[in-house]
Amino acid sequence: MFFICSSLKEINLSSFNTENVISMSLMFFACKSLKELNLSNFKTDKLTGMEEMFYGCSSLKELNLSNFNTNNVTSMHSAFYECTNLKNLNISNFNTENVTDMSDLFLKCNSL
């Protein structure tokens, strides 16, 4: 959706309706200038794919995904790959019971 929006620094997603979304793969891929992201209103009950969702978001320093329902997610491959400045990541409510691919999930997340 915001694939390679390399100049994107901030975005207001408060009115996004995500209740029927099944894949958020590549959603913020290579948004290297994105500094802040509030996804607290996202409904993820039907979500199955999170592959490379935040891949290359190297300016993000914190991300709160505690509201994400990941009960149906099967792939998180490279979801946070190369989020080099990410220091605070809240995934406290993630359920990975059905995830079959977590490869490279936090690769090059040197600040975590």
What are these regions (language model features)?
Residues M1-L112:
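Negatively charged
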